[in-house]
Structure formats: structure tokens, C-alpha cells
Amino acid sequence: MATKAVCVLKGDGPVQGTIHFEAKGDTVVVTGSITGLTEGDHGFHVHQFGDNTQGCTSAGPHFNPLSKKHGGPKDEERHVGDLGNVTADKNGVAIVDIVDPLISLSGEYSIIGRTMVVHEKPDDLGRGGNEESTKTGNAGSRLACGVIGIAK
């Protein structure tokens, strides 16, 4: 059983990063940094497929094995892959430090082999008042992505 995973984020533009995942008890700790972002919040999600053959678009929708509506990471109603937002500073750097109780590195909610995506816009956490908000959080285009793999 995997206890650690890693993801290297790359896109067509300047956005890149490395994200580490570590199982700790009933949670997964997500840490790392992303550079090349515009200042402010950016949606940060695990998407269903580990397919990046067509860039980040072939990663499919948010990882949602429970068939729920989109929400924030602290909401009862959320996709498993909904990790909310990362916040970039004025230099375009986002430091990631998330503890999530729903994602896993093993079992039916495992994120291994799926794609991590950082988005262009803030995730409205399903509170945007339109249908797209309940699917994607209106987070916009996919700036960078990478497949999550088992780490040592």
C-alpha cells in the first residue's frame, strides 16, 4: 500500500510545480509549491483520469466516485477531488499545505494514477449560483497538470 505520492505539474505556459502527498492516519497531507501563477486564488482539483495525451483536457472531470455536486474541501457535498483553492502571492508562487480527509492513496478513493490540475480562476466552491458552479466551481481553464504517481 502506497503511503507517499508525487505529482509534477506542467502546462503550455509558465505554470509549473511539484506536489507531494503523504498518508497520515485517516488523512492525506498535500504539500508543495506552484510557480508562474497570477496573484490570487486558483482552483486545485484531482481529476478522474491519468490521461494527459491531449494536455490537461483529457484528464476528464473532477474525481467524483460518489456522484456528488461540486463543493469546497470542508463541505459534506463535494467531489472527492475537490481540494479548493491555492493562493499565489505577488510573485506568482503558491505554497500548498492541505490536509484532506477524503482523498486516499489506496482503496476506492485512491488518487494514484489520476491527474492533479491547477486552474486559471478561483474555485467558487459550488456557491456560484449556476450549473457550472455545481460541476467545476467556475475555475476556468486548466493551466498545468500532472499524473499522481507512487513515491518512495
Swiss-Prot record:
Palmitoylation helps nuclear targeting and decreases catalytic activity. A lipid is attached at residue 7 (S-palmitoyl cysteine). One of its GO terms (biological process) is regulation of multicellular organism growth. SUPFAM superfamilies: Cu,Zn superoxide dismutase-like. It holds the Pfam family Sod_Cu. Keywords: Acetylation, Antioxidant, Copper, Cytoplasm, Disulfide bond, Lipoprotein, Metal-binding, Nucleus, Oxidoreductase, Palmitate, Phosphoprotein, Zinc. Chemical modification of Arg-142 reduces activity by 80-90%. Destroys radicals which are normally produced within the cells and which are toxic to biological systems. This is Superoxide dismutase [Cu-Zn].
